[in-house]
């Protein structure tokens, strides 16, 4: 297998991190985002902490783990994970889950896996979300691999086949678990049905017949349940706009900085 075919989509290798960290640290847009997310820590200290990370897991434990547990502490009554159906912690799994929030779904899963003595997951993320170069770099530091969108039909087939080969390689050879949503985009109406195209994509890689290829992925269906949908008011707003404006299409990203009423 020629692993270089995955270079465009895979997470960074650990030996690539020092250069990527320096590129991020030198990026004014990343500096602004980092100081906004962690306002009480000087950026120089954040940069020093980044440079001390030797692996992607080091980075996740240094930054993501604490931030996600703080979100959980501040905005939830607690997180739980029932992992009893797949007790073998040494195996890699493909967690296919319903989808509510691209950061929290996979992030909460990863920190709960860490607390059970397991590795974090690699995350399938669409390139439509990677609107700035620093975001694309950061998610690949955070063990994400890229799902390419907005392609021609032929390009989409080629991209799907490559991603399937990468996922089979990740599970079988790297022994690294994966998180992927069961459908493209969030289920805004809570209709959590797995898209046929997701299963077809998984079966494009590997060897043997259809069942063999899917079995090779060690699929673990995952149901994520939030008392309140993390993006509920944004989804309601979009539904209303689609109802009231003929031909409405979501084309802009609205950022809200005021706290949610339920957090006050």
Indicate where each model-derived feature is located.
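Conserved nucleotide-cofactor-binding alpha/beta core module
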Residues: 122, 126-146, 150-153, 157
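Conserved small/polar residues in nucleotide/adenosyl-binding loops
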Residues: 256-263
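Membrane-anchoring hydrophobic helices of lipid-metabolizing enzymes
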Residues: 1-93, 99-110, 114, 120, ...
């Amino acid at each position: 297998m020629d692993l270089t075919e995955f270079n465009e989509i895979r997470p960074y290798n650990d030996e690539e991190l020092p250069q990527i960290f320096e590129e991020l640290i030198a990026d004014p847009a990343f500096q602004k985002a980092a100081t906004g997310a962690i306002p009480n820590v000087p950026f120089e200290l954040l940069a020093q902490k980044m440079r001390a990370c030797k692996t992607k897991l080091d980075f996740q434990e240094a930054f993501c783990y604490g931030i996600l547990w703080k979100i959980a502490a501040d905005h939830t009554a607690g997180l739980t994970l029932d992992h009893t159906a797949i007790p073998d912690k040494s195996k890699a799994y493909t967690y296919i889950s319903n989808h509510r929030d691209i950061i929290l779904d996979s992030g909460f899963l990863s920190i709960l896996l860490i607390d059970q003595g397991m590795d974090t997951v690699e995350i399938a993320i669409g390139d439509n979300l990677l609107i700035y170069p620093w975001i694309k770099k950061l998610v690949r530091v955070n063990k994400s691999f890229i799902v390419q969108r907005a392609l021609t039909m032929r390009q989409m087939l080629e991209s799907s086949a490559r991603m399937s080969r990468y996922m089979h390689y990740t599970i079988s050879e790297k022994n690294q678990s994966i998180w992927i949503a069961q459908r493209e985009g969030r289920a805004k109406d809570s209709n959590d049905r797995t898209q046929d195209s997701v299963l077809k994509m998984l079966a494009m890689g590997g060897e043997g017949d259809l069942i063999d290829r899917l079995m090779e992925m060690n699929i673990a269906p995952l149901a994520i349940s939030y008392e309140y949908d993390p993006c509920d008011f944004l989804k309601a707003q979009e539904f209303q706009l689609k109802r009231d404006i003929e031909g409405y299409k979501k084309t802009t990203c609205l950022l809200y900085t005021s706290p949610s009423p339920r957090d006050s």
